[in-house]
């Protein structure tokens, strides 16, 4: 039977979309096929479903998502009664349920007066669907005692109507009340109650939303700038010195278009990072001169300047009526919402309570979710030497918002801050270090000179070397100030990896450093090694690569079944190349008799059960290999790229293995998600019994 989860509420303004998004994230980690159903819907686009469809790559036909609109439902109820309405909605729900393992049901929004008792309506729908219920209570603007009473009453109401209440969620609670309220509710209710604090970034409208609502014209700014949250509104009418003192981080400056001094002053303050602003909104439909706009564009590239026709007072009223929304056009809000949900909800316990069927398949999305979850479970510090690179900054924002790991970014601190401000990126909670001016430079120079004394490196030379961001980052890892390092988006592989070879070096039981790719196919993840480092490993080195790759696979939840690849299977071939693979296979068996391994074996026999049944019947590995070891770099690199292109696989990596501490190299074409994944992998590699890094 399909399991379903019904997220509902008791009134408007509860910020329930945070919970709906969080539950969807949770379900897609565990289950491949997740459907969505909204029993009643208003006319117009469903922005939350569009977000879910884009973020989770849902193939579900949008026409099946909705039961019916409110007007249709009201008419049906009036003409044929409530039972007929329920029967129709249940039939439409089951059209979705039959095709999915789990269905997330999005309850009504309490915005329609045609159904005066929407709580009872949601409760009955949940019961008819056989769905477990997660009621959400809004706490904004209420005392802790009021929220406690409302939550208790909501629980009793849904339970009294026969619902299977999975957990309660209280959202938008004042931060100072959250901890005490959570403790009191935990002792009051028979089910878990998760209390989420109010998060200003979620309720703040974006500059794009404001522009659309007010019918504004964009004079300056790019898409990234328009996506910034307007966390505050500062109205400019004072003289410049007083106006500058009033600026707050993330504020939208609202001023008449003829106040060129305030426009330039606000953007100059943004450029200096004191403080970074969301943008400038010009009233009275007055456009500054071209000279002022040119100066503004140079002061703060990408920062939006928008013109509207209204005067300041009507504009202010409209601004204060706007509230931020989660939708496909606000990915930053989605990351913030998920970070909030994952920080305050025991997702492991909630998933157990859902009792969602575990899938035998492991899709690319499920693998990526598991990476973030595993990294978050034991947070580590990762240093990113390329702190001024745009993609790295965007990835850092995602990692920080989701609470995946702690971050240190290297580079000129003023440049990092300015670049982040220009991109509208919040790096709060990260550590910024300039290797050139850092107090660590002297001690790092001495350390590096000691390590490279046999190469004749003096302290003076070392002082210059450690100013390089990759050497500095590697020394942070070596000295326990970071747990791992990720670089390479603008540096060569050699520039990224060479410092690790010189400083961190290999594990005691490892002869070489190698790499693997996680190849995320449609329904499983395979581990390919080595496709990036060793050109032509000998039998002993190939054995080392196989053992390392098996350990890496297991660390990331892939049960290792090793296929030592060659152009022939079993004893059918001969020659130096196949003999090398045969010898390496035997060495693995001698070294680790607990590992399942087969070799030499051809690729098709390794992964296709039908071929394996003919060529190697009875093998524990053939037809179901999960770790594929290539005989040389030429074969491995070409194969992973061929599979990536022809099979549409997502390649995550390369993941370096064999170093005493994790350092990973990015492709110079890496996308933001690639960087996020690689940082998460690095953090997971650092999760060991050793002490965590200590930030300086």
UniProtKB/Swiss-Prot annotation:
Catalytic activity reported: acetyl-CoA + phosphate = acetyl phosphate + CoA
Disulfide-bonded cysteines: none
Pathway(s): Metabolic intermediate biosynthesis; acetyl-CoA biosynthesis; acetyl-CoA from acetate: step 2/2
Coiled coil stretches, renumbered: none
EC number(s) reported in the record: 2.3.1.8
Main subcellular localisation: cytoplasm
The keyword Metal-binding belongs to this UniProt entry's keyword annotation: no
Signal peptide segment: none
Domain comment as written in the entry: The N-terminal region seems to be important for proper quaternary structure. The C-terminal region contains the substrate-binding site.
PANTHER family, per the entry: PHOSPHATE ACETYLTRANSFERASE (PTHR43356:SF3)
Function: Involved in acetate metabolism.
Name listed for the protein in its UniProt record: Phosphate acetyltransferase
Organism: Streptomyces avermitilis (strain ATCC 31267 / DSM 46492 / JCM 5070 / NBRC 14893 / NCIMB 12804 / NRRL 8165 / MA-4680)
Source organism phylogeny: Bacteria, Bacillati, Actinomycetota, Actinomycetes, Kitasatosporales
């Amino acid at each position: 039977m399909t399991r379903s989860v019904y997220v509902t509420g008791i009134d408007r303004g509860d910020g329930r979309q945070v919970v709906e998004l969080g539950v969807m994230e949770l379900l897609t980690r565990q289950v491949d096929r997740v459907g969505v159903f909204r029993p009643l819907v208003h006319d117009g686009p469903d922005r939350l479903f569009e977000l879910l469809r884009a973020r989770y790559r849902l193939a579900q036909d949008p026409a099946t998502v909705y039961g019916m609109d409110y007007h249709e439902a009201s008419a049906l109820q009036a003409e044929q009664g409530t039972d007929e309405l329920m029967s129709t909605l249940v039939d439409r729900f089951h059209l979705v349920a039959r095709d999915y393992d789990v269905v997330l049901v999005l309850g009504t929004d309490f915005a329609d007066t045609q159904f005066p008792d929407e709580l009872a309506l949601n409760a009955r729908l949940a019961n008819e669907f056989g769905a477990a219920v997660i009621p959400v209570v809004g706490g904004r603007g209420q005392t802790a005692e009021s929220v406690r009473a409302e939550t208790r009453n909501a629980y009793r109401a849904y339970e009294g109507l026969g619902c299977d209440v999975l957990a309660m969620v209280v959202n938008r609670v004042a931060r100072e009340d959250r901890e005490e309220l959570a403790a009191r509710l935990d002792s009051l209710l028979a089910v878990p109650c998760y209390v989420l604090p109010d998060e200003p970034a979620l309720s703040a409208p974006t500059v794009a939303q404001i522009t659309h609502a007010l019918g504004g014209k964009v004079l300056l700014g790019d898409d990234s700038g328009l996506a910034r949250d307007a966390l505050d509104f500062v109205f400019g009418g004072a003289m410049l010195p007083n106006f500058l003192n009033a600026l707050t981080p993330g504020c939208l400056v609202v001023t008449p278009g003829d106040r060129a001094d305030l426009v330039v002053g606000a953007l100059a303050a943004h450029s200096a990072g004191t403080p970074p602003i969301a943008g400038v909104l010009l009233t009275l439909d007055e456009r500054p001169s071209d000279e002022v706009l040119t100066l503004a564009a140079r002061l703060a590239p990408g920062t939006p300047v928008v013109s509207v026709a209204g005067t300041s007072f009507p504009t202010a009223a409209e601004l204060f009526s706007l509230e931020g929304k989660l939708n496909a056009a606000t990915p930053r809000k989605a990351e913030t919402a998920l970070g909030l949900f994952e920080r305050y909800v025991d997702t492991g316990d909630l998933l157990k309570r859902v009792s969602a069927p575990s899938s035998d398949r492991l899709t690319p999305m499920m693998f990526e979710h598991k990476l973030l979850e595993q990294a978050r479970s034991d947070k580590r510090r990762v240093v990113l030497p390329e702190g001024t690179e745009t993609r790295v900054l965007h990835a850092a924002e995602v990692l920080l918002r989701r609470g995946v790991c702690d971050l240190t970014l290297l580079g000129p601190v003023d440049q990092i801050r300015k670049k982040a401000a220009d991109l509208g990126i919040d790096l709060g909670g990260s550590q910024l270090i300039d290797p050139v001016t850092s107090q660590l430079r002297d001690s790092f120079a001495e350390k590096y000179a000691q390590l490279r004394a046999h190469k004749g490196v003096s302290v003076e030379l070392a002082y210059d070397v450690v100013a390089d961001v990759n050497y500095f980052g590697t020394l942070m890892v070596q000295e326990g100030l970071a747990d791992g390092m990720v670089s390479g988006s603008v540096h060569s592989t050699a520039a990224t990896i060479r410092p690790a070879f010189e400083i961190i070096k290999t594990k005691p039981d490892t002869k070489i450093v190698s790499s693997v790719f996680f190849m995320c196919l449609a329904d499983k993840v395979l581990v390919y090694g080595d496709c990036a480092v060793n050109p032509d490993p000998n039998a002993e080195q190939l054995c080392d690569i196989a053992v390392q790759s098996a350990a890496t696979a297991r660390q990331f939840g892939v049960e290792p079944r090793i296929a030592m690849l060659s152009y022939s299977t079993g004893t059918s071939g001969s020659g130096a190349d196949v003999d090398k693979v045969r010898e390496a296979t035997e060495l693995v068996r001698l070294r680790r008799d607990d590992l399942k391994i087969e070799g030499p074996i051809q690729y098709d026999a390794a992964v296709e059960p039908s071929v394996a049944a003919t060529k190697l019947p009875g093998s524990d590995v053939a037809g179901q290999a999960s770790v594929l070891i290539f005989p040389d770099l030429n074969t491995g690199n070409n194969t992973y790229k061929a599979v990536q292109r022809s099979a549409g696989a997502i390649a995550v990596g390369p993941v370096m293995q064999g170093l005493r501490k994790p350092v990973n190299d990015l492709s110079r074409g890496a996308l933001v998600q690639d960087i996020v994944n690689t940082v998460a992998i690095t953090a997971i590699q650092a999760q060991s019994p050793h002490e965590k890094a200590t930030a300086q």
